[in-house]
UniProtKB/Swiss-Prot annotation:
Free-text function comment from the UniProt entry: ATP-dependent RNA helicase required for ribosome biogenesis. Involved in the release of U14 snoRNA in pre-ribosomal complexes. Required for pre-rRNA cleavage at site A2.
Family in the record: Belongs to the DEAD box helicase family. DDX10/DBP4 subfamily.
Gene assigned in the entry: DBP4
Protein's organism: Phaeosphaeria nodorum (strain SN15 / ATCC MYA-4574 / FGSC 10173)
Residue ranges constituting the Helicase C-terminal domain according to the UniProt record: 269-441
Protein's recorded name: ATP-dependent RNA helicase DBP4
Quaternary structure (record): Interacts with the U3 and U14 snoRNAs. Associates with pre-ribosomal complexes.
Short sequence motif Q motif: positions: 49-77
Length: 803
């Protein structure tokens, strides 16, 4: 017997390699045991309450234990055993009942038993989600459960990320969580991405994925997938259409519905109410509700992204006292992730959202779900209200219904087992924000434009609804609704106008009498040939703002009519709405000097301002023109030039330079006489001014002389004061002065002179000599400056100048 850990070789086997070999053997044994246990599993007769009762692998058990999942929910108790056996499943359960784990666990276990691991194995499971947020949430749950020992390579495919980086990593993936659009893009464009070995296909929120919105993408994806696979479908409102099931190639699917026999299709802990609220009172009611629920977590649903943005921006300016957030499909992916993270972690917050947040998202502890706009159908209502009352937690849902929507919507809710009770709003608690919205829209054109787009998108969504019994557009008071948004007038809706024109056209056709068939039809006039020069002269100037923006921002309900004449003077037949570009200012070539400041030359959306002091009105048709009204300097250029007037002795005004008429000029006499008179008058004026100038100069000279004498007198008095007579004390002043001078010299000698700075290593004696010579020359120059008095001084001066 050899030593432990020693093989036939002389060197011992590495401990790490030996451990990996032993682990591989244990995995093979575990897989065999799991296969046998799953074969003996009986989903129909067996009772399974805990996850420990199921034949699961150790990594999955550790992941469930780490996430504190021990007891299975109703949908998990029925769906997981069937999925482990390899059956196709149609799973339906209420919102918040744990459907995500119902397909995450079978995906991990089935691939683990098949040992579908590694880059060579290829893609084993594909999970499709209708929204990016739900896909991210599923991927997070997959990572939490599978990170405790599973060796699968999992990936997330959603829009908004680098396509090239995903393309490089795709061939190594074993499990993918994706949205249909991104998945189809890689299947059609990434050559190295193969799905021939796919074992499982999972569709979360399957009814939404299989509807018209994703029909083409899903059909194209299924064409790439192999026919032999396991398919799992889960949703709160499951589809049983034979056409949908045939598209997915399901083989004897098991329909699992744990709440089909319940009295309600929604959780029992969910309290559901509805309010009869006309369109014009919806925002007032919503604002009052938010003011009364500042300590709650609220989720508000609208039908369009424009409505979400408008309500968010307007409410944010009014500061309701609770954090506001908004999410919609037109946001970038980073902003959407930040919003969902903030709302999930917040205790008190209000999130305005579209249906992008209606399915699958798990926001913890949501107190209220408010549906301001009526949902498209009952399934949408169930998914929206399912964001609260999750995992047996209490929650409340409030639905706003217009009077015309009440009867039809309640009938459909009752048919789907959704109990809803009516409640009333106290009028004392309701606050009107109509005036505040009007003020904000007046001050901020961008907010006004956003409100108009919100109005149009809401009307369009109602117009396109299939259920005309619930959504009756004629029953809505659109003018009052537009006023409640703060808009000065009702925006024009193009498709409504087209419907009216079609009705008028059909009515007129019925009243027209059919002419006799024998009558010959009048020959149609041939259209004239239009050259490129004709098209060039028919061009219109581009406006500063887009056409649709100006149409919406213009106040009032009046139609914008087309200009009366075109460039050539002929009458136009198309209205302003049919033109691609509107005419900003059109000037005919023959009438260049005409006045075009009137209202006829104003472009759609423009206005005319009459300025005081200006003969021509100012046309405001752009932001630059609007800012011009605030600049006094620029406005003065538009004013008429003023005239300076001079008044005569009688008080009559005259211009500074007035031209005489020929008759007045002749009445004054001959030109030679007038010239002589002018010269004499000018000479008198000059002589008078000369006398005044001489008197002024004489006075200045006298004043200058007086000031000089005063200054000399003051200097003489100062010299007299300084001459002080010395007192005779009998002492010799000269001797005292010499003694003091000798004493000061001794003191100066005793003072220690400062030490001279030491030389550096790079300095030489020549530098000191040069400095001393410079000082001598400087001293000599200072001595030269003094005025010489004797012959010696003059010689010193000459020597200094010469050298």
């Amino acid at each position: 017997m050899g030593a432990p850990g020693i093989t036939g070789r002389t060197r011992p086997t590495k401990v790490k390699k030996q451990a990996s070999q032993q682990k591989r053997k244990r995995d093979d044994v575990d897989v065999e045991k799991l296969e046998q246990a799953v074969t003996e599993l009986d989903p129909k007769t067996g009772t399974y309450n805990d996850f420990s009762d199921l034949p699961l692998s150790d990594p999955t058990k550790q992941g469930l234990k780490a996430c504190h999942f021990a007891v299975m929910t109703d949908i998990q108790r029925k769906a997981v055993p069937l999925a482990l056996k390899g059956h196709d499943i149609l799973g339906a359960a209420k919102t918040g009942s744990g459907k995500t784990l119902s397909f995450i666990i079978p995906v991990l276990e089935n691939l683990y038993r098949l040992q579908h691991v590694g880059a060579d194995a290829g893609l084993g499971a594909l999970i499709l989600s209708p929204t990016r947020e739900l896909a991210i949430q599923i991927f997070d749950v997959l990572c939490k459960i599978g990170k405790h020992g599973h060796m699968f390579a999992a990936g997330l495919l959603i829009g908004g990320k680098s396509l090239e980086s995903e393309r490089q990593a795709l061939p190594r993936m074993n499990i993918l969580v994706a949205t249909p659009g991104r998945m189809l893009q890689h299947l059609s464009q990434t050559a190295a991405f193969l799905v021939d070995d796919l074992k499982m296909l999972v569709l979360d929120e399957a009814d939404r994925i299989l509807d018209m919105g994703f029909q083409r993408d899903v059909d194209a994806i299924i064409d790439y997938l192999p026919k032999e696979r396991q398919t799992l479908l889960f949703s709160a409102t499951q589809s049983k259409k034979v056409s949908d099931l045939a598209r997915l190639s399901l083989q004897d699917p098991e329909y699992v519905s744990v709440h089909a026999e319940d009295k309600s299709a929604t959780p029992k802990s969910l309290q559901q109410n509805y309010i009869i609220c006309p369109l014009e009172e919806k925002l007032d009611t919503l604002w009052s509700f938010i003011q009364a629920s500042k300590k709650s977590k609220i989720l508000v649903f609208f039908s369009s992204a424009k409505a979400v943005r408008f309500v968010y921006e307007s409410f944010r300016h009014m500061q309701p006292g609770i954090p506001l957030l908004h999410i919609h499909g037109r946001q970038k992916q980073g902003a959407r992730l930040d919003t969902t993270a903030k709302f999930s972690s917040a205790k008190n917050s209000c999130l305005f959202a579209t249906d992008v947040a209606a399915r699958g998202l798990d926001f913890p502890a949501v107190d209220f779900v408010i549906q301001v706009d009526c949902p498209d159908d009952v399934d949408t209502y169930i998914h929206r209200v399912g964001r609260t009352a999750r995992y047996n937690r209490e929650g409340r849902g409030v639905l706003f219904l217009a009077p015309s929507e009440e009867e039809g919507m309640l009938k459909r809710l009752e048919a789907k087992k959704v109990p809803v009770e009516a409640i009333n709003v106290r009028q004392k608690k309701r606050q009107s924000i109509k005036e505040q919205l009007q003020n904000m829209c007046f001050q901020d054109p961008a907010l006004k434009y956003l409100g108009q787009k919100a109005f149009m998108t809401y009307v369009k969504s109602v117009y396109l609804q299939k259920d005309k019994e619930v959504f009756q557009l004629k029953e809505y008071d659109l003018e009052a609704f537009a006023a409640s948004l703060g808009l000065p007038g009702t925006p024009r809706i193009k498709f409504l106008k087209d419907d009216n024109s079609k009705q008028k056209k059909q009515a007129s056709r019925q009243t027209i009498e059919v002419s006799d068939s024998d009558e010959e039809e009048a020959p149609k006039a041939e259209k004239p040939v239009r050259t490129k020069y004709d098209r060039m002269f028919e061009r219109k100037n581009q406006d500063v703002l887009a056409e649709h923006y100006k149409k919406l921002v213009r106040d009032g309900d009046e139609e914008i009519s087309a200009p009366a004449n075109d460039f050539s003077g002929e009458a136009t037949t198309n209205g302003a709405d049919d033109d691609f570009l509107a005419i900003k200012r059109r000037i005919p070539a023959d009438d260049e000097d005409e006045d075009f400041g009137g209202e006829a030359s104003v472009a759609p959306g423009g206005r005319v301002v009459h300025l005081a002091g200006a003969s021509q009105p100012l046309i405001i048709d752009s932001n630059r023109r609007e800012k011009l009204l605030q600049s006094k300097k620029k406005l003065t250029k538009l004013m008429d030039r003023g005239k300076k007037l001079v008044y005569d002795d009688d008080g009559n005004p005259h211009e500074v330079y007035e031209l005489e008429t020929e008759a007045d000029f002749k009445a004054k006499g001959l030109p030679e006489h007038q010239r002589q008179k002018f010269i004499e008058a000018a000479r008198e004026v000059v002589q008078t001014a000369d006398v005044e100038d001489k008197a002024t100069a004489r006075a200045k000279r006298k004043e200058k002389l007086r000031k000089r004498k005063e200054r000399e007198r003051g200097e003489a008095e100062d010299d007299g004061d300084e001459a002080v007579e010395l007192e005779d004390t009998g002492e010799n002043p000269l001797a005292n002065f010499l003694a003091d001078a000798q004493y000061t010299d001794d003191e100066q000698e005793e003072v220690e002179q400062p030490k001279k700075k030491e030389k550096k290593w790079f300095q030489s004696d020549s530098e000191d000599e040069e400095k001393s010579s410079k000082k001598k020359r400087k001293k000599a120059k200072q001595q030269v400056v003094e005025e010489p008095e004797t012959l010696e001084d003059m010689e010193a001066l000459a020597a200094g100048l010469l050298g």
